[in-house]
């Protein structure tokens, strides 16, 4: 048996399983490249060198000599300079049968395609993504009830079994290479999503609808794509299961045949389908009897609307990773005398003055500076609403969590420069999928920041905020406040403080002043504090 040395790259537990096989067989692992803390901890416990992926990886591995590179559950493209370091070659694990389902999330797309067979593939890294020669492939039949969760589990098991066979070849005669027939290739991109944000088209057959729901069922694990959705009246609800049922009377497409705690039975393009596990977009359960009754007609999804939703969802998909991270770790503020959010907002507004001399991103930075001063926080989230937010029929947010970071000794000009790239990202991806909370177990709830910053023309604050500063196209400002959460006098004081900050920063000479030294009290409030509240009788 010919033992060899290796470097492993990946971010899931499958890497550990394969690494243990290597070590048990007497092979050497010269480095593990990962961003996953559990894998880093395991590697450290095993006494293995650990490197983070990303910029400079080839330089950091400059002194590492190895035979094989294994890419296992790794979703990032490996730099060619790193691949070139492997003396014998680089091998990738793919959770689908190549060339039929190349790219990402192969199990999901296989179920959506209603495939009869699936499998896993170990292949050489060469040419384009997932195009290299096949070394080992395990195929298996798919059950009719397969979900993304069950199919991923079966892929995991097949990966471990086939890796043992791959090692036998590498230890013996060498890799057995089989070129792919790329004419049979289907490639699934990172940003590919089911059509119409996975909103169910009831005109489809019951089998197609069931496949959509099963394909997006990841159990309690992270769902990287979307949740299946059903429009009921003016609400968009999530669906956990959809099973075609015979034995019901003929029904029109969208007609509700049954509404009980056991689910909704609705007419489709073939058999009626029973929808169960209804919840709102944050994953909170919804009883079917509260949203529809037998005899109701659910709205149908026409082709024009479906295309518009697909385009809207696609336009913001690239920003999802950033907003997901922000929603996982919200940085809230707690302004004094502001109550918790209520079910019914009552918006009032007041015009603001003092913004003369400020425009564009500097004006927005001045508003953020005011929030930093009145909240006393150096790091906080603002609900940012751009002037152009795509419409996905209730499937997208109309704001994003803009995380602001500053310090008392940071000059305003420096802060404003640092805020610009954050604003640019928010403009490129001004919304996130509202089912993101239900898809990610690490997001406990959708936390809307207390303060919003809006560039839209809507005559109200951002839903869920207590205060929203609205910047009109001509640069004029208004402060919208929810009077169910704070009194008029409190809003007036906050407005005066914002005007004081704007007035000060309207002078270019003041923009080099550290943020912590910018005045926020108006003359009236200052006199009240110094000579009103603090006055004493002799």
Features from the language model and the residues they span:
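Alpha-helical oligomerization interface recognition
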Residues: 52-127, 131, 209
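His-Asp-centered acyl/peptidyl-transfer active-site segments
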Residues: 357-358, 374-465, 487, 511, ...
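Flexible, non-catalytic linker and terminal segments flanking ANL/adenylate-forming cores
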Residues: 292-341, 426, 492-538
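An anion-binding loop in the catalytic cleft
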Residues: 4, 23, 201-316
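N-terminal Rossmann-like dinucleotide-binding module
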Residues: 1-35, 41
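Extended, hydrophobic beta-loop-alpha segments that form or line the acyl/peptidyl-thioester binding
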Residues: 378-385, 462-519
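Acyl/amide activation-and-transfer machinery of modular secondary-metabolite enzymes
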Residues: 27, 133-139, 187-197, 301-308, ...
């Amino acid at each position: 048996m010919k033992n060899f040395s290796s470097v492993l790259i990946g971010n899931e537990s499958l890497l550990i399983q394969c690494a243990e096989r290597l070590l048990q067989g007497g092979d050497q692992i010269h480095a593990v490249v990962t961003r996953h803390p559990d894998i880093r901890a395991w590697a450290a416990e095993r006494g293995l060198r650990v490197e983070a992926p990303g910029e400079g990886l080839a330089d950091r591995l400059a002194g590492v000599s190895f035979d094989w590179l294994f890419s296992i559950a790794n979703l990032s493209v490996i730099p060619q300079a790193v691949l070139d370091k492997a003396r014998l070659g680089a091998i990738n694990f793919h959770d689908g049968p190549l060339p039929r389902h190349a790219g990402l999330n192969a199990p999901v797309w296989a179920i959506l395609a209603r495939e009869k067979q699936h499998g896993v593939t170990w292949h050489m890294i060469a040419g384009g993504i997932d195009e290299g020669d096949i070394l080992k492939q395990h195929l298996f039949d798919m059950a009719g009830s397969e979900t993304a969760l069950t199919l991923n589990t079966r892929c995991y098991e097949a990966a471990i079994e086939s890796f043992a066979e791959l090692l036998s070849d590498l230890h013996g005669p060498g890799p057995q290479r089989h070129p792919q027939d790329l004419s049979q290739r289907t490639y699934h991109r990172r940003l590919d999503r089911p059509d119409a944000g996975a909103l169910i088209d009831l005109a489809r057959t019951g089998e197609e609808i069931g496949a959509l729901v099963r394909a997006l069922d990841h159990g309690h694990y992270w769902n990287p794509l979307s949740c299946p959705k059903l429009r009921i009246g003016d609400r968009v609800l999530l669906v956990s299961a959809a099973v075609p049922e015979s034995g019901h009377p003929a029904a029109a497409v969208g007609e509700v045949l049954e509404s009980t705690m056991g689910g909704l039975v609705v007419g489709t393009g073939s058999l009626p389908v029973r929808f169960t596990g209804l919840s709102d977009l944050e994953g909170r359960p919804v009883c079917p009897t509260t949203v529809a009754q037998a005899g109701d007609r659910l709205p149908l999804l026409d082709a024009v609307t479906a295309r518009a939703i697909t385009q809207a969802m696609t336009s913001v998909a690239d920003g999802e990773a950033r907003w997901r991270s922000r929603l996982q770790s919200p940085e809230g503020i707690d302004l004094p005398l502001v109550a918790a959010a209520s079910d019914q907002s009552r918006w009032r507004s007041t015009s603001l003055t003092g913004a003369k001399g400020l425009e564009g991103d500097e004006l927005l930075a001045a508003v953020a500076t005011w929030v930093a001063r009145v909240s006393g926080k150096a790091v906080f989230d603002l609900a940012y609403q751009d002037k152009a937010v795509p419409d996905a029929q209730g499937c997208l947010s109309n704001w994003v969590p803009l995380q602001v970071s500053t310090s008392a000794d940071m000059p305003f000009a420096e802060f404003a420069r640092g805020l610009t790239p954050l604003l640019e990202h928010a403009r490129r991806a001004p919304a996130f999928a509202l089912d993101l909370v239900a898809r990610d177990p690490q997001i406990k709830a959708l936390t809307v920041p207390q303060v919003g910053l809006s560039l839209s023309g809507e005559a109200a604050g951002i839903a869920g905020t207590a205060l929203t500063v609205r910047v009109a196209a001509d640069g004029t400002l208004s402060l919208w406040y929810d009077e169910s959460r704070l009194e008029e006098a409190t809003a007036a004081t906050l407005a005066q403080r914002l005007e004081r900050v704007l007035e000060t920063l309207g002078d270019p000479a003041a923009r080099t002043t550290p943020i912590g030294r910018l005045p926020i009290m108006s003359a009236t409030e200052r006199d009240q504090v110094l000579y009103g509240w603090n006055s004493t009788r002799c």
